[in-house]
Amino acid sequence: MRQDLPRGVAPSVILIDPKYPHNVGAALRACSCFDIAQLWWTGQRVTIDPVKGERLPREERMKGYRDVQMCPAQQPFDQFDRKAVPVAVEVRQQSECLTLFEHPDHAVYVFGPEDGSIPKAVLGHCHRFVHIPSRHCLNLATAVAVVLAHRRMWRQLNGKEPLLPLSEMLHEQRGLHRASPTLDSMGWDGK
């Protein structure tokens, strides 16, 4: 385990060599929405160096993302203990369909790049393999959101997480039923 990197916390998400910063940003938002504490990614195509003023696209508008630790690392699996269960999310023969997938408590979801597949060396770390039942490949960030949403619903249906009322689930103000002071001052017609 490298000391300069954080210890892996499962459940977690690992992106293998993502190509686009906006997909990393949207995956970060999905992690925040579904209570995933860490987003790891490998490769050199997406770099975020706050010292150089680099940030993810739209980061300043992403509410709640600060509860997710961003972890760029070339060997992220080394940071997790033995309880972690790496799950490759990929279109491949003999993989489990997400519809019936039973999510491990300590899952580490592994997603390949936008322009390729998960390399064999990475697949060798994975204990489970799952595919999303869609007619076409999904955008990377969309795939992350779909899997994490399914995880939340599966855990709720199996009594592992409470099914909270919307008022307790949302951590931000949304919807017309709770108008903001700005909307109140403008009126409902925007004037």
What are these regions (language model features)?
Residues 22-23, 96, 117, 138-139:
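Residues that form or flank phosphate/diphosphate-binding pockets in enzymes
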Residues 26, 121, 138-142:
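An amphipathic alpha-helix/helix-turn recognition signal
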Residues 135-152:
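Short alpha-helices
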Residues 9-13, 123-132:
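Glycine/charged-rich beta-loop-alpha catalytic/anionic-binding loops adjacent to active sites
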Residues 1-91, 145, 152-191:
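RNA substrate-binding interface of SAM-dependent RNA methyltransferases
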Residues 16, 42-43, 129-136:
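Short beta->alpha connector loops at strand-helix junctions that form conserved
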Residues 71-129:
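Internal catalytic-core helix/loop-beta-alpha segment
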Residues 18, 92, 116, 134-137:
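Short, surface-exposed acidic/glycine-rich loop or hinge patches that mediate macromolecular interfaces
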